[in-house]
């Protein structure tokens, strides 16, 4: 299939089997109303599942965020055995922590909240009851409220704006060792808003984890995004789409 191909694949007939998604996620996707994926979206999900560092370069409206959410959700460790063991060890002290597996940085409060809703809808268990917690941390909300939720220890997907996530990093309010996927959604927009220092504060300590997978979405690669990618992301797979915005 050529890059930017506009024809659609029937997700219900082909995509589930070819992508190897877990059954509960498939059921949630159906319930959410997604019936088709483009070849571009399928390629994004495939590369995420294969643990590649991925740069998704496409205009808005091509379904890239849905692709990121589906791909990362499929990699959640649902057994949570390691998380629960570590949490029990932490509970022997005065501090309690969450052990998020996915950390996603977004440019705006609105996008963070919208993405949280989609993660919650696609990540729910039977009858759409979440077996894990999705937390959106944004400015304008008291940070003490975020900290109280993180102390409960069940946050597996952490979303937020750069300033708030950087603040939580500096306060050491969640365990970073369990993070296996770091996502920068709309990196070009994040950098254009002047958050480069905050992104560095977030990514530098995580880069010590050799198993960390980094995923970026961007609408074009300019000097700012190119410098960031070259500095912090090892051997990324670039997936580029030139197709027109697609509506489900």
From Swiss-Prot:
A motif (Q motif) lies at residues 14-42. A motif (DEAD box) lies at residues 185-188. One of its GO terms (biological process) is P-body assembly. GO terms for cellular component: cytoplasmic stress granule; P-body. It comes from the Eukaryota. Keywords: ATP-binding, Helicase, Hydrolase, Nucleotide-binding. SMART domains: DEXDc. ATP binds at residues 58-65. Belongs to the DEAD box helicase family. eIF4A subfamily. Residues 45-239 form the Helicase ATP-binding domain. One of its GO terms (molecular function) is hydrolase activity. This is Putative eukaryotic initiation factor 4A-like protein. It comes from Dictyostelium discoideum. The keyword Zinc does not apply.
């Amino acid at each position: 299939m050529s890059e930017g191909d506009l024809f659609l694949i029937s997700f219900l007939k082909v995509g589930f089997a070819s992508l190897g998604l877990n059954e509960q996620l498939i059921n949630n996707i159906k319930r959410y109303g997604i019936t088709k994926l483009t070849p571009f979206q399928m390629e994004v999900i495939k590369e995420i599942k294969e643990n590649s560092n991925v740069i998704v370069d496409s205009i808005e409206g091509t379904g890239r965020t849905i692709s990121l959410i589906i791909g990362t959700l499929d990699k959640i460790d649902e057994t949570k055995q390691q998380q629960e063991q570590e949490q029990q060890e932490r509970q022997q002290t005065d501090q309690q922590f969450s052990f998020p597996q996915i950390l996603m940085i977004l440019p705006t409060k609105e996008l963070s909240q919208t993405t949280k809703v989609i993660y919650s809808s696609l990540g729910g268990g039977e009858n759409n009851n979440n077996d894990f917690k999705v937390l959106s941390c944004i400015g304008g909300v008291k940070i003490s409220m975020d900290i109280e939720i993180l102390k409960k220890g069940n946050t597996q997907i952490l979303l937020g704006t750069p300033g708030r996530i950087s603040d939580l990093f500096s306060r050491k309010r969640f365990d970073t060792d369990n993070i296996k996927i770091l996502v920068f959604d709309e990196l070009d927009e994040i950098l254009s808003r002047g958050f480069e220092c905050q992104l560095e504060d977030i990514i530098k300590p995580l880069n010590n984890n050799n198993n960390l997978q980094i995923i970026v979405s961007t609408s074009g690669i300019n000097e700012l995004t190119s410098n960031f990618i070259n500095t912090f992301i090892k051997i990324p797979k670039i997936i580029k789409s030139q197709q027109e915005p697609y509506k489900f």
